[in-house]
Amino acid sequence: MSKLVLASASPRRRELLARLGLPFTIQPSRIDESVYRHLPPAARVEALALAKARAVAAGLTDALVLGADTLVVCEGRVLGKPDSPAAAARMLAFLSGRTHTVYTGVAVVQAPRGPEGVTHARTAVTFRHLTPDQIEAYVATGEPLDKAGAYGIQGRGALLVAGIEGDYFNVVGLPLVQVEELLAIFGVDVWGRV
């Protein structure tokens, strides 16, 4: 099997990929994400995941590079990572009592310029009605500051969620079923390594 490389600095993606039991290394990508802002959410996360994987793959040989990107969308508004505690509080107040959609694109590229595969997952998440005190307390934990949509469902942010429809791991940042399916296309048997 070619060496597997995760093109992400996300600790959540690292933890999720490790669950598959495959050895991998990490090499974060450096791309200009702003050039994809005009695309609709599903196309955007796929394009960004592919761009991240390609950027890392270009400098490698004999490696499979996995890229991913996640967006949160509510009522047509894309919510990225908040740039301050105040921005996080505004996002959480906006999401309160609403259902939003989490999109994660996943791409695999055979380095350096080989075959590519890309797909995405989509999950609906409904937030509880949050009080200003709950929002303030959650923001004070610091947890929302490095996450799209200003919450982490795998942490204390779970208390904000009334329910989800779809893949939980997609909301965390890496839809494992799609990852397994893409890796299988490239000859990686996740089940044979469990």
Curated annotation (Swiss-Prot):
The active site is at D69. The keyword Cytoplasm applies. The record marks R12, T70, Q154 as: Important for substrate specificity. It catalyses: dTTP + H2O = dTMP + diphosphate + H(+); UTP + H2O = UMP + diphosphate + H(+). InterPro entries: ITPase-like_fam, Maf-like. Pfam families: Maf. GO terms for biological process: nucleotide metabolic process. Keywords: Cytoplasm, Hydrolase, Nucleotide metabolism. It is found in: Cytoplasm. Its cofactor is a divalent metal cation. Its EC number is 3.6.1.9. The keyword Metal-binding does not apply. GO terms for cellular component: cytoplasm. GO terms for molecular function: dTTP diphosphatase activity; UTP diphosphatase activity. HAMAP family: Maf. Nucleoside triphosphate pyrophosphatase that hydrolyzes dTTP and UTP. May have a dual role in cell division arrest and in preventing the incorporation of modified nucleotides into cellular nucleic acids. Belongs to the Maf family. YhdE subfamily. This is dTTP/UTP pyrophosphatase. It comes from Moorella thermoacetica (strain ATCC 39073 / JCM 9320). The lineage of its organism: Bacteria, Bacillati, Bacillota, Clostridia, Moorellales.
